Amino acid sequence: ICCNPACGPKYSC
């Protein structure tokens, strides 16, 4: 997962 807004479309928590 990627809990950072910088991840763009990959954002997930």
From Swiss-Prot:
Q: In which organism is this protein found?
A: Conus obscurus (Obscure cone)
Instruction: Please provide, alphabetically and separated by semicolons, the GO molecular function terms listed in this UniProt record.
Output: acetylcholine receptor inhibitor activity; toxin activity
- Keyword Secreted in annotation: yes
Alphabetically ordered keywords of this record = Acetylcholine receptor inhibiting toxin, Amidation, Disulfide bond, Neurotoxin, Postsynaptic neurotoxin, Secreted, Toxin
Note whether Secreted occurs among the keywords.
Answer: yes
Give the family, as the similarity comment puts it.
Belongs to the conotoxin A superfamily.
Its GO CC terms are: extracellular region; host cell postsynaptic membrane
Tissues of expression: Expressed by the venom duct.
Q: Which cysteines are joined by disulfide bonds?
A: C2-C7, C3-C13
The protein's name is Alpha-conotoxin OIB
Q: Where in the cell is it found?
A: Secreted
Q: Which residues carry this modification: Cysteine amide?
A: C13
Function per UniProt: Alpha-conotoxins act on postsynaptic membranes, they bind to the nicotinic acetylcholine receptors (nAChR) and thus inhibit them. Is active on muscle nAChR. On mice muscle receptors, its higher affinity site is the alpha/delta nAChR subunit interface. On Torpedo receptors, it does not distinguish between alpha/delta and alpha/gamma acetylcholine-binding sites. In vivo, causes paralysis followed by death when injected into goldfish. In contrast, has no effect on mice, when similar doses are intraperitoneally or intracerebrally injected.
Q: What else is known?
A: The primary structure of the mature peptide is identical to that of Alpha-conotoxin SI from Conus striatus (AC P15471), with the hypothesis that the first residue is an Ile.
Q: What is its main location?
A: secreted
Q: What is recorded about the protein's domains?
A: The cysteine framework is I (CC-C-C). Alpha3/5 pattern.
Q: Which domain of life is it from?
A: Eukaryota
